[in-house]
């Protein structure tokens, strides 16, 4: 449990750095749009995202060879981690800015073949 909390805190701090210095889009429609354009570097999905939406995002991410991270908190916690006062189910990072969030994600979450 302690390890899980520590990794969640490190992801949250990296997310906050992306919000300050990087470029990102929030929401399903915008996420799918940047995935189709091939601009997304990393997708983050909350754990209570509906299964159909989750599989649709994972399918487009696989086609675009983009990493997908399943956030361990729900959409309210993901919104709070992003510094927003609303729920965020999906988030696409197009430019990480000063953050090393893309390099720091474990290999199994990136969806890429080893």
From Swiss-Prot:
The gene is RPL30. GO terms for cellular component: cytosolic large ribosomal subunit. HAMAP family: Ribosomal_eL30. InterPro entries: Ribosomal_eL30, Ribosomal_eL30-like, Ribosomal_eL30-like_sf, Ribosomal_eL30_CS, Ribosomal_eL8/eL30/eS12/Gad45. Disulfide bonds: none annotated. It holds the Pfam family Ribosomal_L7Ae. It comes from Branchiostoma belcheri (Amphioxus). GO terms for molecular function: RNA binding; structural constituent of ribosome. Keywords: Ribonucleoprotein, Ribosomal protein. PANTHER family: RIBOSOMAL PROTEIN L30. The keyword Transferase does not apply. This is Large ribosomal subunit protein eL30. SUPFAM superfamilies: L30e-like (SSF55315). Belongs to the eukaryotic ribosomal protein eL30 family.
